[in-house]
Amino acid sequence: MSTLAAPTPSNPRWLFGPVSDLLFGCGIAYMGIFALMTVAAEQVEATVPITSFLLITLVIAAPHYGATLLRVYESREDRRAYTLFTIWITAGLIGIFVTSLYSPVLGSLWFTLYMTWSPWHYSGQNYGLAVLFLRRRGVTIEPRAKQLLYASFILSYAIVFVAFHTGVSSTGYGPALPQGDSYVFVPIGIPLYMANALYAGLGGLYLLTTAGTLFLLARGSNLRDLGPALVLIASQALWFAIPGLARASGTLQGIAPLSNLTAPYIGLWIAIAHCVQYLWVTTYYAARDENHVGRTRYLTKALLAGSAAWGVPALLFSPGLLGNVPYNMGLFMMVAATVNLHHFILDGAIWKLRDPRLAKILLRSDDSVGPRLDRGGSSFVRPLFWATGFVCLVIFVVGDLEAQYGVTRAGERGDAARIEKATRRLARIGRDSPKLHHQLALLAQRDGDLVRAETEFKAALEVYETKNVWHNLGTMYLSQQRFDEALHAFDEALALDPSLAQTRVHASTAALSLGQRELALDHLKAAARLAPNDRGLRRRIVELGGEPNPPGQALP
C-alpha cells in the first residue's frame, strides 16, 4: 500500500510535489485535454465516448463526494462541530429530494439550482487553491490584490451564469448527465439584448480585474512563486470565462473545446478535472489530519462512502419501492442534484483557511497536528456502512455496463434477446424503465410478434406512463382494428401532452371507425390548430362536414 507523500520542511512549497500538484491541483491535465480536443476532437470523442463517462464519473466523482462525507461524518469531533450541517440541513435536503420526486416543478427548480451552483463551487475551489499556493510560498497578498483576484473568479462565474439563464442554456457545464423527461432546466430568461450587454460588461471587468491581480502580485514576487496560482487563474479562464464568451459571441467556434456543439462533452471533462483536484487536496489533508495510513485505503473508503450516498436513495426511491420516477427519467437527476448540493453546502462549511487546524495543515510544513478525537460509532454500524457502499458500487458498475452494452449497443444491432436480459437485470437493481420495455415492444412489432409487443407496451406503462408508449400502443391497436382500445390509448397520450397533432389524427380515425363523428371532427380541428399549414387536415375536416378553417386560423 502506498503512503501519502507529505511535504517536508525543506519542501514547503508543494503538497505532494511539483508534478502532481501542477497536473491535478492546478489543472494542467485539463489543459492537455483542451489541447487534444483542439487538434483531434473527433478522435478524442471516439476514444472516450460520452457514454463512458458513466463509469469514469463513478470512479472519480463518487470518491470526490465520499471524501467530503469522511471529512464531516467520520470523526466524532467533526460530527459535533458541524451538527447544523450534518443533521438538520441534511434532513432538509432529504425532504426536498423526496418531495421533488412527486413535484416536477420543485424538481426542475432543484435541478436548476444544482446546475447553477456547480460552476460557482468549482470557481471557489480554484480561488481557494490559488490563495493556498501563494501563502505557502510566502507571497504577500495585499488586500487590494486579494480583492481583485476574488473578483476575477466571481466575474468568470458570472459569465457562465448569464449563459445558463439566457433562454435555454446549452453551455453544458456541470457534472451530471441530464437524462430524464420529468425535469427540465428552468432559466431565469434574461433577454438576449440584456445578455449581450452583460457579456460585454462582465468580459471587460474580468480582463481588468485579472490584469490588475497579475500586476499587483508581480510587484512583490517572482514568477517561480506565482507559478501555481497563475496556472489556476488560467484554468479558471479555460473552464468558464473564455468558452462562455466565445460561445455567447459565436467566435472561435472552429476550436472544438470552445464550440457550442462540444459544450456538453467538454463540460464533463471540466467536471472530472474538478473532482480530481478535490481528491488531490482532500487526500493530502486526510493523511496529515486523520491519520489514514495509506492513500489506497483512504480513496477506497471515499469511493464506498460516495457510492452509498448515490446508491441508497436511487435504490430506495426506485419505482416499486418508495418512489415513482424511473432512474433514467428523473430519479438520477434528483439524486445528482441532492448529493451535489449537499456536497456544496458541506464544503462551504468545512474548507475555510481561517480554521486554525485546516490552516496549520494546508499552509504550513510541520508534519503533525496532534491526535484526532475518537471517531466513535457502534461496532456494527461501520461494517454495515462499508458493506452498503460496496453493494451500491456493484449496482453502479452492473447498471452502467448493462445500460451501455446490454441496451445501447444491443439496440444498435437490433438484438432483442440481449436487451430483454439487460432489462431483467436492470429491474432487479432498481433501474427498470419504460424506455426499455418500449424498445422491446418496437422490436417485437418489427418481427411481427404483436402479442409480445402488447405485453411489453403494457409493462412499460406499469413502470411509468409516457405519451410515446400510449401513442405507439394506440397505433398498434388501430392497425389491428381494435378501435375502442386504440381511442383509449390515444386519449391517455393526449392527457399527458395535448399538443400531439399526429396522436389527434389517429384518435380521429379511431373515433370515426366507432361512429363517433363529432369526436373525430373535434380531434381533427385540434390537430389543425397545432399544424395550421397542413392542407390535408383541412380537407378531412371539410369531408366530415366541418368548417374548412379552424377558428382563428387563416389559409396561408
Question: In which residue ranges do the predicted regions lie?
Answer:
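Hydrophobic alpha-helical transmembrane segments in integral membrane proteins
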Residues: F390-A417
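Residue-level recognition of tetratricopeptide repeat
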Residues: T408-G411, L442, T475, T509, ...
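Short coil turns that delineate tetratricopeptide repeat
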Residues: R428-D432, Y464-E465, P498, P532
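Helix-start (N-cap) detector for alpha-helical repeat units in TPR-like alpha-solenoids
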Residues: P434-K435, L450, K467-V469, F483, ...
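Register position in tetratricopeptide repeats
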Residues: R446, S479-Q480, S513-L514, E543-E547
